[in-house]
Amino acid sequence: MFKHILIPTDGSKLSSEAAEAGVRLAKALGARVTGFFAAPPATPIVYKALLPVGYATPDEHRKMIEKTARSCLGVIEKAAKAAGVPCETVSVTSDFPADAIIAAAKKRRCDLVFMASHGRRGLRRSSLLGSETQKVLSNGNFPVLVYRKM
């Protein structure tokens, strides 16, 4: 049925739980996984001297994002290794995480996206899904399995 599962993560607790559940599903199906992380780009600065105290330079931002991506994707890699599931990881820079998830699923020919119901920003009271999950469901042309903690 499903042979290649894209598992996006933002590093939130629910996203990490979803990643582990996605790996378990992949093992049960005999599928491989691709862990995916989309990071926001650094805001360009014109003059370093004008950078407010506490703000990172673009290079510092890049290093922080790389460290965060390694940490977030490491959860998926560790779960996949323990389960004996083939795994690769991808990290991109994007202002639009849902679009990046859709593009990655298409580019890598994933036949399922397995993602958390919501990420870092959480849910509004009237929502069942987070905004990025909703966008992937609405705009992707592939199956999406949404993991929701009960």
Whereabouts are the PLM-identified features?
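Small/aliphatic-rich secondary-structure junction motif
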Residues: 1-56, 81-83, 88, 139
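Short, well-ordered secondary-structure micro-motifs
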Residues: 18, 45-48, 99-102, 125-127
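Residue-level recognition of beta-strand->loop/alpha-helix junctions
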Residues: 37, 91-93, 148
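Short, hinge-like loop/turn segments at secondary-structure boundaries
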Residues: 50-54, 106-108, 131-132
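A short acidic, glycine-rich active-site loop
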Residues: 55-71
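Structural beta-alpha unit
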Residues: 75-113
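Glycine-rich, Arg-bearing micro-motifs that act as flexible, cationic patches
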Residues: 112-138
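Short, flexible loop segments at boundaries between secondary-structure elements
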Residues: 142-150
